[in-house]
């Protein structure tokens, strides 16, 4: 039976029967297009990024099986992880993007309506285990279809020079005056320690885990370990 899970709660728990599951679609790549006088067609610039995607489920609501209307609406409010039974081993970051027909739900014991989610472009592995690095030259392999934006926590002290090498090149990062630990979050493009903003302590680009092998090395201050949350992702 088809289902979806949003914010850790299954559609089955909410009294929803899925008549039509969401389609599997690839996000559109973003381009800028220019018309140039005297030139055929368009001049296209690839921005290297992707648009959001839409995942729509056509559902039947069985009022008797619904915990409560307030609980249903609270569940569908805000952003969270979305898992479809079609691809049950990965999730999207999503939020509901259409109005829920409250009047019809209240008046009818059984009602059919769509639930449409706007999703960030990529899907991510449900299993996103932290990888611990304690030795120079340790390699993390990205076997997914997209370069990933990891979150790294470096444990150590002093000024640390961190390098991450792949077939695409080297990320060179300097972390100044580290005391105990510092976190580099590529997804949010922030460097911090707890609630403390540490962007001024970091020089270099936020690292990407490229497809294939990524090798970690460091010099300078002392490093006891690096914890890597890889955030491996896919195009669908």
Feature-to-residue mapping (PLM):
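Mixed-charge, glycine-accented linear interaction segment located at domain edges/termini
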Residues: 5-9, 118-120, 208
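Solvent-exposed loop and beta-edge segments used for protein-protein assembly and interaction
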Residues: 49-53, 76, 107-111, 144-146, ...
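Oligomerization/assembly interface segments of phage tail-like spikes and tubes
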Residues: 34-64, 109-122, 214
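Exposed beta-strand and adjacent loop surfaces of beta-rich binding modules
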Residues: 31, 54, 79-81, 149, ...
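Solvent-exposed edge beta-strands and adjacent loop segments
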Residues: 1-52, 89-103
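Short, charged interaction patches at domain edges and termini
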Residues: 99-132
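Short, acidic/charged, Gly/Pro-enriched secondary-structure junctions
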Residues: 58-99, 215
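Intrinsically disordered, low-complexity segments enriched in serine, threonine, and glycine
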Residues: 125-236
């Amino acid at each position: 039976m088809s289902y979806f899970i949003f914010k850790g709660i299954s559609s089955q728990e909410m009294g929803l029967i899925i008549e039509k599951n969401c389609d599997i679609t690839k996000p559109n790549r973003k381009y800028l297009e220019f018309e140039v006088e005297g030139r055929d067609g368009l001049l296209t610039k690839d921005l290297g990024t992707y648009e959001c995607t839409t995942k729509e489920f056509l559902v039947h609501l069985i009022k008797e099986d619904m915990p409560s209307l307030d609980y249903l609406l609270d569940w569908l409010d805000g952003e969270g992880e979305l898992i479809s039974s079609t691809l049950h081993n990965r999730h999207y970051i999503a939020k509901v993007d259409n109005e829920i027909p409250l009047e019809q739900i209240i008046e009818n014991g059984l009602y059919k309506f769509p639930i449409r989610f706007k999703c960030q472009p990529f899907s991510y592995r449900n299993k996103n285990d932290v990888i611990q690095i304690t030795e120079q030259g340790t390699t993390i392999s990205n076997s997914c279809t997209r370069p990933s934006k990891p979150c790294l926590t470096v444990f150590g002290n002093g000024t640390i020079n961190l390098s991450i090498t792949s077939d695409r090149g080297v990320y060179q990062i300097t972390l100044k005056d580290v005391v105990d630990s510092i976190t580099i979050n590529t997804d949010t493009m922030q460097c911090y320690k707890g609630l403390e903003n540490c962007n001024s302590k970091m020089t270099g680009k936020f690292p990407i885990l490229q497809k294939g092998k990524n090798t970690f090395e460091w010099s300078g201050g002392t490093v006891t370990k690096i914890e890597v949350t890889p955030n491996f992702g896919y195009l669908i």
